[in-house]
Regions:
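Intramembrane alpha-helical segments
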Residues: 2, 77-168
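Small-residue-rich segments of transmembrane alpha-helices in multi-pass membrane proteins
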Residues: 17-23, 147-162, 208-213, 277-291
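Membrane-embedded alpha-helical segments that form the functional core of polytopic membrane enzymes
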Residues: 21-22, 26-62, 119-130, 170-190
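Helix-coil boundary and interhelical linker segments in multi-pass alpha-helical membrane proteins
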Residues: 24-44, 103-119, 157-178, 232-245, ...
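Functional transmembrane core segments of multi-pass inner-membrane proteins
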Residues: 29, 33, 149-200, 214, ...
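Acidic (Asp/Glu-rich) catalytic motifs at the cytosolic membrane interface
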Residues: 48-74, 185-208
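Multi-pass membrane catalytic core of lipid/isoprenoid biosynthesis enzymes
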Residues: 68-113, 205-240, 284
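Extended hydrophobic alpha-helices typical of membrane-associated regions
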Residues: 233-304
């Protein structure tokens, strides 16, 4: 059981939860009624889907894991290298989690009378997570892994949170999803930076494996600058008044921007210093999301 929990990488669930809650709180702040039941049942769609990705990635990528290779933010868990007898159970756990996610999605739509097109999001999210590393698709080896991760983590997860409260994805929701999509791309590029050598050995055509760590840090830096600029300036062009102070969110976005700019300036080529900066970028992205959740929760509590 302990070994399977290591494969699950429970620490990464915090990011998924915070993004889901962020989407839900944005909907409430924009006027949607709050429902604890919808919030909890909706998360039972997201949680198994995210866990399934952790299990399926370890199962299909075991050939590319290296003993001692994993870092805090990247690399396989290493469990299946040491315990190959767990490979089949891990595969079936991943499949079972997908089926559970879809079943809860159907239950959610039936009990809360939501439109059935939302099931398209649920099925698509699970399909993308499976195809990320599973043959014959193996999107992570075809230069498509970044787009898949960005779509799933940066768009689908917070969008599902928004949908559970509002029941539709409107202009207000999309306005908030744009920076989260960019942050999703920052996150996956940061995770790829420590894995560059192993990905090249495994013929994974990740953007960092193909173009190098310097390229990864440059893209990350520009994306983080774009998000901070978005929070400080772009909201002025939104057609109606929004009930929050974007300067606060902009200041919070400086948390991931600072290590991002450090990586952009230094562009370390060696694994150890590069992994250190990439780790800080991922950690500060998570902290940013949690702090924004706190701010939105404060605003929502004043509206309830």
């Amino acid at each position: 059981m302990v070994k399977l929990l290591k494969v699950a990488r429970l620490q990464f669930l915090i990011v998924g939860l915070s993004l889901y809650v962020l989407g839900a709180l944005v909907a409430v702040v924009l006027g949607a009624p709050f429902s604890l039941g919808r919030l909890l049942v909706g998360y039972l769609v997201i949680l198994p889907a995210q866990l399934s990705v952790h299990f399926s990635n370890d199962y299909f990528d075991v050939a590319y894991d290296r003993p001692g290779g994993p870092t805090l933010i990247s690399g396989g868990g290493g469990v299946l290298l040491e315990h190959p007898e767990l490979r089949e159970p891990v595969k079936w756990i991943a499949i079972g989690l997908i089926l559970f996610s879809i079943a809860v999605g159907i239950f959610f739509i039936r009990i809360y009378a939501f439109p059935w097109w939302i099931m398209g999001f649920v099925v698509l999210g699970n399909l993308v997570g499976w195809c990320y590393s599973a043959p014959p698709f193996r999107l992570s080896q075809r230069g498509l892994g970044e787009l898949c991760y960005t779509f799933a983590a940066g768009f689908l997860v917070p969008a599902m949170g928004y949908l559970t409260m509002r029941g539709a994805l409107d202009t207000g929701g999309m306005f908030f999803l744009v920076p989260l999509i960019l942050y999703g791309l920052v996150s996956i590029l940061s995770v790829e930076i420590p894995d560059m050598e192993d990905d090249r050995l495994g013929n994974k055509r990740t953007w960092v494996a193909v173009r190098g760590r310097g390229f990864g840090f440059m893209v990350i830096g520009w994306l983080l600058l774009a998000v901070t600029g978005y929070f400080f300036f772009f909201h002025r062009f939104y057609p109606r008044q929004l009930p929050l102070d974007f300067r606060i969110v902009g200041y919070l976005s400086l948390l991931p921007l600072l290590p991002g700019l450090l990586g952009m300036i230094k562009k370390p080529a060696e694994k150890q210093p590069a992994a250190k900066i990439a780790t800080w970028i991922v950690i500060t992205l998570a902290v940013f999301s949690i702090f924004v959740d706190g701010y939105l929760l404060y605003l929502a509590s004043r509206l309830l």
